[in-house]
């Protein structure tokens, strides 16, 4: 089972809702995992769900709270395989003295792609086996700095990781939306889900 930290929002009727993105769930299923939605609510209940999962995905979203950071800290402290996407990556970075910047007048567009450069000594390079790839852009904020290892950059930090954990990797882009046509993005989910379930090599 692969847990996904759910996002909170309000319906048009004003009801509180929690959700995971379909592309995230589909990516997990494609590589043999079972997606488990995890509500960020009561701390102990959330941890109980997390401890039943082989790995955790921190999906993208608009906002986060201290509750989210506390959960991310738990994931790191307990060496639970963790993949952070967009805001998820930013939360991982913030946990380690990270600073965020804002992109003024930015328009989200999953069809817009740009090139990033991957550190050849990083886990991300081990997974993708290329030092330059194209990724999409949807974020309004970006990570200026963090004490975690920076594994990919463009004009901003694009990926971070910890070399002290079995898998603690965050990416600024949305690989789940590129699964249908980009084999390199598939490799991220294949490695993470397979490793979480069967063990990392």
Task: Locate the predicted segments by residue.
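Short catalytic/ligand-gating loop segments at beta-alpha or beta-beta junctions
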Residues: 132-140, 160
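Active-site-proximal beta-strand elements of phosphoester/diester hydrolases
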Residues: 151, 168-173
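A short linear hydrophobic-aromatic micro-motif
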Residues: 134, 149-151
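N-terminal beta1-alpha1 cap of cysteine-dependent amidohydrolase-like domains
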Residues: 1-87, 94-95, 107-121, 125-128, ...
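Post-Walker A helix-loop "phosphate-sensing" segment adjacent to the P-loop in P-loop NTPases
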Residues: 96-101
């Amino acid at each position: 089972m692969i847990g996904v930290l759910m996002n909170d929002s309000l319906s048009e009727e004003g009801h509180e809702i929690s959700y995971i993105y379909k592309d995230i769930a589909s990516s997990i299923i494609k590589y043999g995992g079972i997606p488990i939605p995890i509500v960020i609510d009561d701390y102990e209940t959330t941890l109980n769900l997390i401890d039943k999962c082989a790995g955790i995905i921190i999906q993208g979203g608009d906002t986060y709270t201290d509750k989210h950071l506390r959960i991310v800290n738990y994931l790191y402290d307990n060496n639970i395989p963790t993949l952070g996407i967009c805001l998820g990556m930013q939360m991982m970075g913030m946990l380690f003295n990270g600073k965020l910047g804002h992109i003024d007048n930015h328009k989200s567009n999953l069809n817009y792609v740009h090139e990033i450069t991957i550190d050849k000594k990083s886990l991300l390079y081990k997974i993708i086996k290329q030092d330059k790839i194209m990724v999409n852009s949807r974020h309004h904020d970006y990570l200026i700095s963090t004490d975690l290892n920076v594994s990919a950059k463009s004009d901003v930090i694009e990926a971070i990781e910890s070399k002290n954990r079995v898998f603690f990797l965050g990416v600024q882009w949305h690989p789940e939306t590129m699964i249908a046509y980009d084999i390199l993005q598939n490799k991220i989910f294949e490695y993470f889900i397979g490793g979480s379930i069967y063990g990392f090599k």
